[in-house]
Amino acid sequence: MDDWDTMIDTNVKGLLYVSKAVIPFMTKRNKGHIINLGSVAGKDVYEKGNAYCASKFAVDAISKSMRIDLLQHHIKVTAIHPGAADTEFSLVRFKGNKDDAAKIYDGYKPLYAEDVAEVIYYCSSLPQHVCINDLVLTCTAQANAFYTFKG
């Protein structure tokens, strides 16, 4: 249960609170760009992913709603949904067990934080009149939240 609370506090409430803090400055300037990090788990659900998937589906819904609400203020909203990425997320998921975390990526090359950062940079460097609304990013071995080729 504590993990669920932390997950929802971080992925949903954190997104809402930070957005609430920065949006007034963007609306005052009549421009800005919000980039939210979702997950492929926010696009497709999978076994034993109920709380995590729900929190990432919320990121997707919040991003879509924000995009509509902020159109009149010329504020772009981009949601980036990475797939399997070799980050500290796996360590958290496996309670700090490095061996179990590393096994997740056996047989294929996952995304790395730098890959996601490059995509964020690209999205943020587009002209003001261009917005990537929704982007699903996976390694070439991954089709979606369900299918990853390990071989």
Name each model-derived stretch.
Residues A21, D44, S65-I75:
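Active-site-adjacent segment of SDR/Rossmann-fold oxidoreductases
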Residues S39:
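Residue(s) in the substrate-gating loop at a strand-loop-helix junction
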Residues D2-D5:
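Substrate-binding pocket helix/loop in short-chain dehydrogenase/reductase
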Residues S19, S55:
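Active-site helix of classical SDR
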Residues A79-I80, T87, D99-A145:
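C-terminal helical subdomain
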Residues A21-N30:
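A short helix-coil junction within the Rossmann-fold of NAD(P)-dependent oxidoreductases
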Residues D44-N50:
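Active-site loop immediately N-terminal to the catalytic Tyr-X3-Lys motif
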